[in-house]
Amino acid sequence: MPLSMLQRGESGVVKSIHGKPKDIHHLADLGLVVGATVKAVNEVAGNLIIEVKGSRLAMNKVMANRIILEV
């Protein structure tokens, strides 16, 4: 399921990331890679706040739709 559908407090494991290579590389620099566990923390102004590898990140829903999780 896409990361954008994760509800607050739920977690999932990244199975695939779709998008431009530069975007995928940027996400990898932030710790968001295949196999990483992601937790939905909050939603603010249409952006998702997620926690990955101990850090919190804000992400718009367009990008969150490109990240596929196994819940």
Residue ranges and their predicted role:
Residues 1-71:
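Compact, glycine-rich, soluble single-domain proteins
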